[in-house]
Swiss-Prot record:
This is Ketol-acid reductoisomerase (NADP(+)). Keywords: Amino-acid biosynthesis, Branched-chain amino acid biosynthesis, Magnesium, Metal-binding, NADP, Oxidoreductase. NADP(+) binds at residues 25-28, 83-86, 134. Residues 183-328 form the KARI C-terminal knotted domain. It comes from Dehalococcoides mccartyi (strain ATCC BAA-2100 / JCM 16839 / KCTC 5957 / BAV1).
Length: 332
């Protein structure tokens, strides 16, 4: 049974006198920093000097400095730079600022779990991972609600790492929605699997396969786009709101019967076997090794695949159709 913490389990006073340093002011960084500040906590931000994050954090009223300076000053250091940058940032600028009594925090376990960052034994190492994008973490906080988070403790040098992490979670508003206890290993492996097999890799491959099947059978690409991509949001929103059963109760009986009888033919035993292989590559570290080496080599495979995918017909058709949808506003 999952252990979930709520407001009664979180004591904000534990970190009220501590200085919190946020590394990065991007998608998650801005939300963490602003929520913590609005909770009455002391926050400083570390970014690349003169960069977009530096300018934005300064405009938002934060004291901004280089990472090395922040690491010396802060009692709690939350690593919110991109995963692929964190190991270098840590080695170059954070490690030398760590002292007994400090806590190093993460919002994703990749670098700790796969040994890219190895903190000294005298610091607490914890994770608070909000289960939503940064803009939503900020939005629900300003509305008086909160987003759920995962909590994990990798090192408890102080003897109160969990309590301190729970206080941080309250600072960003997760006490209002629930803070589920996990481990760095479980968070990392399930997060990667979800991205690869379902949320990103699985979904985009399914959408493209459906689109290509219809187009190759002679149907208009525009109609195929609507049926296989555009309407996906309607179904996902229903599942998000009330689960799979709620979604099925909200669609026609014809759609439901097709779901029950044809869905398992698309996602079949072969798919389960492949999913197991993908999970195995995550668990044994082979995916992490592949991705780390890809970055070290300058991302040749990544860049080639990204370019190829951007040229898919579904992108051309989608751009044309979306340009006529006045309610869609492209984010700047």
């Amino acid at each position: 049974m999952a252990v979930i913490y709520y407001d009664k389990d979180c004591d904000l006073s534990l970190i009220e006198k501590k200085l919190i340093g946020i590394v990065g002011y991007g998608a998650q960084g801005h939300a963490h920093a602003q929520n913590l500040r609005d909770s009455g906590l002391k926050v400083i931000v570390a970014c690349v000097e003169g960069g977009r994050g530096w300018k934005k954090a300064t405009a938002d009223g934060f004291e901004v400095m280089c990472v090395a300076e922040m690491a010396k000053k802060a009692d709690i250091i939350m690593m919110l730079a991109p995963d692929t940058s964190q190991a270098k940032i840590y080695k170059d600028s954070v490690e030398q600022g760590l002292k007994p009594g400090k806590m190093l925090m993460f919002a994703h376990g990749f670098n700790i779990h796969y040994g890219q960052i190895v903190p000294p034994s005298f610091v607490d190492v914890t994770m608070i991972a909000p289960k939503c994008p940064g803009y939503m973490l900020r939005q629900v906080f300003t509305e008086g609600a909160g987003a759920p988070s995962l909590i994990a403790v990798e090192q408890d040098a102080s003897g109160k790492a969990k309590e301190l992490a729970l206080a941080y979670a309250k600072g960003i508003g997760s006490n209002r929605a629930g803070i589920l206890e996990t481990t760095f290993a479980e968070e990392t492996e399930t997060d990667l699997f979800g991205e690869q097999a379902v949320l990103c890799g699985g979904t985009t491959s399914l959408v493209k396969a459906g689109f290509e099947t219809l187009v190759e059978a002679g149907y208009q690409p525009e109609v195929a786009y609507f049926e296989c991509l555009h309407e996906l949001k309607l179904i996902v929103d229903l599942m998000y709101q009330g689960g799979i059963a709620y979604m099925r109760d909200s669609i026609s009986d014809t759609a439901k019967y097709g779901d029950f009888t044809r869905g398992p033919r698309v996602i079949n035993e072969d798919t389960y076997e492949t999913m197991g292989e993908i999970l195995g590559e995550i668990q044994d570290g082979s995916f992490a090794k592949e991705w780390i080496l890809e970055n070290q080599a300058g991302r040749p495979v990544y860049n080639s695949l990204r370019r190829m995918e951007s040229e898919h017909l579904i992108e051309e058709v989608g751009a044309e159709l979306r340009s006529m949808m006045s309610w869609l506003k492209k984010k700047k």
